Design a protein with these regions (language model features):
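The conserved beta1-alpha1 loop
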Residues: 19-23, 102, 237
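Flexible "cap/lid" loop of the alpha/beta hydrolase fold
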Residues: 107, 111-114, 119-155
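Active-site loop/oxyanion-hole signature of alpha/beta-hydrolase fold enzymes
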Residues: 1, 6-12, 42-100, 281
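Catalytic active-site module of serine/aspartate enzymes centered on a nucleophile-bearing elbow/loop
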Residues: 250, 255-343
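Helix-loop "lid/cap" segments that line or gate small-molecule binding pockets
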Residues: 164-179, 187-192, 203-210
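Conserved serine/cysteine hydrolase catalytic core
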Residues: 197-254, 263
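Serine-hydrolase catalytic-loop signature spanning alpha/beta hydrolases and amidase-signature enzymes
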Residues: 23-33, 46
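Alpha/beta-hydrolase active-site loop signature
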Residues: 25, 51-55, 130, 268-271
Length: 343
């Protein structure tokens, strides 16, 4: 595959490299507001790359990809290769690397950080999805090479990628509908015109789950890294997300207790695009706190409570409503039950 990426910042002067990983159906364009804002700081180099089968990362002409799966494992390997061979080889040996991911990109950031510990110093999760992939192993006939499956999928695919449906899906996940611009819709639809797009779509949804670690194992590994190796973890979630609701952020915060957790409101599933000024301020504050300042309290005190009409709230993880309280009780009860049964 030809891997497309963009970079803003001075490779020679940067002390921290932030690599943004996008969600399903979008690409590098979803992070241009972060690249433009952060790349102007000579201490930071901001990157965004398109995962294979998304954005502008597609097979080269004549490339044989019959056995290639568009899956968490393949994307994990792609990100690791990108960090090692592109980012680190072009930088000084003392730089820090932070992965920042939205939705699918958030889970991918978790997966890479939990399995390639030597190349990451921190992660920032932006409404990271806790689920991706439903099959335990590959089903032989459910492949992108099966022409019957391709023909069967075609009507659904054509409707799924239509302008009307893309707009409808965006209205579900953006709290501020005025942020749904025509250029965003066009950027999402453009990659679906690739001749290989429908096969990548089929492969994406028929490929197995991540094989190395389950989601819970990823969290446990990151928790251990955070507690024992000074690995940095932060969450920056849009509170009005109808898919990855705040409850999921609360769950993650309960596992990784030292994680810094900010909630933005009003903001939906893609805060990086919908409320970029607030996200950029949070990311810059986190980088200052983690790598450029010894005074955490003083850094946080400079972060505004509201930017461009969006509130920025530091959340401690305590349950705030009946749903979060029930979920907290359930987790606590199950944990105690498991502890007593193993004793």
């Amino acid at each position: 595959h030809r891997c497309y990426y963009e970079r803003k910042g001075d490779l020679r002067k940067a002390k921290v490299h932030v690599i943004f990983l996008h969600g399903f159906g979008v690409g590098t364009f979803h992070y241009r507001k972060q690249l433009n804002a952060l790349g102007g700081d000579e201490e930071v180099c901001a990157w965004s790359m398109d995962i294979c089968g998304q954005g502008k990362s597609w097979p080269r002409s004549g490339e044989d990809v019959r056995d290639f799966e568009y899956s968490m494992d393949s994307w994990r390997d792609q990100v690791e290769y990108f960090v090692r061979e592109v980012v680190l080889k072009s930088s000084s040996s003392s730089v820090k690397v932070v992965l920042a991911g939205n939705s699918l990109g958030g889970k991918l950031a978790l997966y890479v950080a939990a399995t390639s510990e030597d190349i990451t110093d921190g992660i920032i999760l932006l409404n990271a999805t806790p689920f991706w992939g439903f099959l335990e192993k590959r089903v032989r006939f459910l492949t992108k090479e099966n022409e019957f499956i391709v023909k069967l999928t075609q009507p659904y695919w054509d409707n799924f990628r239509s302008k009307e449906n893309v707009r409808r899906l965006l209205t579900l996940v953006y709290a501020d509908k005025t942020k749904i611009e025509e250029s965003l819709i066009e950027n999402i639809i453009e990659p679906t015109e690739n001749e290989f797009a429908i096969r990548a779509f089929i492969s994406t949804f028929t490929s197995p789950k991540a094989s190395r670690l389950s989601y819970d194992e990823m969290l446990e590994t990151i928790r251990d890294r955070n507690e024992s190796m000074f690995f940095k973890v932060a969450l920056c979630y849009g509170r009005e997300d109808p898919w990855v609701v705040p409850l999921w952020g609360q769950r993650l915060k309960r596992v990784i207790k030292n994680a810094t957790y900010y909630e933005l409101s009003p903001s939906g599933h893609c805060p990086n695009d919908e409320t970029p000024e607030a996200v950029n301020a949070v990311v810059r504050s986190l980088l200052d706190e983690w790598f450029f300042s010894a005074e955490t309290a003083s850094v946080r005190s400079t972060l505004p409570k509201k930017i461009d009409g969006v509130s920025i709230e530091l959340v401690d993880g305590s349950p705030r409503n009946v749903f979060e309280k029930v979920d907290y009780w359930k987790d606590t009860f199950v944990s105690k039950l498991l502890s007593s049964s193993s004793a």
